[in-house]
Structures are given as structure tokens and as C-alpha cells.
């Protein structure tokens, strides 16, 4: 009887994605420091710092924004910034898709499972066309930069490119290569 290799049961595309994911987990530590990505433990546990504000479809609770309509919760700050109880401190980091994946691993280890890059449709729900100069509700997402943010979605028309949503214009673009550095906002299902 011929021995079958483990990967023989999976299509080639699945093998590539699995190996890419495995490489990220085994890879050396991210150059992005974990403490620069996440809120401080005091900000997460101090009830006095937890604020609930209802704004349209969003409910804001400390470092999270809960999207009541779509059943997801967003990090209030961009990756690299830290929620201090009233705004986002620090510099939002522009990351490649590979480094964004490493930041997601850190977020899942420190804040619980499920954090990921948003889909194109999910990120587009944050666009506020009436808002200026940044096309997002700054009450819910303070200190957001008027720049593109990654989605986790490949452009089906140009498979070497990833979709982004630009919060300066409110438009979606599918022209960024995964090796380019773009801002990141994480989301997870509720």
C-alpha cells in the first residue's frame, strides 16, 4: 500500500494558504512590538474607563466599537495606536499584509480569538460620506488617518492586488500589492 502524504488530500491552493499561515506562526517575532498594538491592561479592566455611547449603528465601549447592524466589533484605534480612555495615542502603523497577519496573531493572543482584517464590505460600512476631513465617524474612531486601510480581500479582477478603503476619499481601491505598507484596523465577529 502506497503511503499518502498529508497534503495529498488538499488542493494545491489550500496547501499554499496553509503553508503561508504556518510560516507566519513559525516565523520569528514580528518587528512590531506587542505593547504598541494593544490597549493597556488597565484600560481594559478599569470600569471607570469604559464608556458606552450610542452613535447610529455603533455602540462604543472603551477600546471597542460594536456594529449593531452587522454583528461585528471593531478595534477603536488603528494598529499601532493604544486606547488611553479618551483617544488613540501613538502612531498608526503602516504594515504589509504579512506584518498585518503577525499583528493579528498578537491581537488574538492578547485580546481573545477572532481578530482579523475586515472584508471590503465590512470596511466600507465605516465610511461616512458626510464626514470631513476624514471619511469616518471620529467620535467612534478617533485619531483615524485619512489614508487607505487594508481589507483581507483579494481583488478578483487583479488577483495580485488587495482591496483597500481610503478614508480620505471614502472610495475603495483594488490596486495595492500585499508588500505595500498600508494602515490596519482589526475586526471580529460578535
Predicted stretch roles:
Residues 2, 6, 18, 30-116, ...:
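Glycine-aromatic-enriched surface loops/turns that form tight recognition elements
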Residues 12, 16-28:
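Bacterial N-terminal signal peptides
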Amino acid at each position: 500500500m502506497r503511503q499518502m502524504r498529508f497534503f495529498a488530500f488538499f488542493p494545491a491552493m489550500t496547501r499554499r494558504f496553509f503553508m503561508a499561515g504556518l510560516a507566519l506562526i513559525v516565523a520569528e517575532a514580528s518587528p512590531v512590538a506587542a505593547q504598541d498594538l494593544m490597549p493597556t491592561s488597565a484600560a481594559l479592566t478599569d470600569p471607570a474607563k469604559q464608556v458606552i455611547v450610542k452613535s447610529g449603528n455603533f455602540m462604543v465601549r472603551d477600546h471597542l466599537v460594536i456594529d449593531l447592524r452587522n454583528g461585528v466589533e471593531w478595534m477603536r484605534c488603528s494598529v499601532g495606536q493604544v486606547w488611553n480612555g479618551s483617544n488613540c495615542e501613538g502612531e498608526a502603523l503602516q504594515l504589509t499584509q504579512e506584518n498585518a497577519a503577525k499583528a493579528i496573531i498578537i491581537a488574538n493572543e492578547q485580546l481573545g480569538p477572532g481578530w482579523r482584517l475586515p472584508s471590503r464590505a465590512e470596511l466600507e460600512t465605516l465610511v461616512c460620506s458626510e464626514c470631513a476631513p476624514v471619511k469616518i465617524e471620529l467620535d467612534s474612531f478617533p485619531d483615524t488617518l485619512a489614508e487607505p486601510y487594508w481589507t483581507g480581500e483579494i481583488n478578483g479582477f487583479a488577483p495580485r492586488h488587495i482591496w483597500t478603503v481610503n478614508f480620505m476619499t471614502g472610495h475603495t481601491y483594488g490596486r495595492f500589492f500585499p508588500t505595500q505598507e498600508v494602515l490596519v484596523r482589526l475586526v471580529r465577529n460578535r
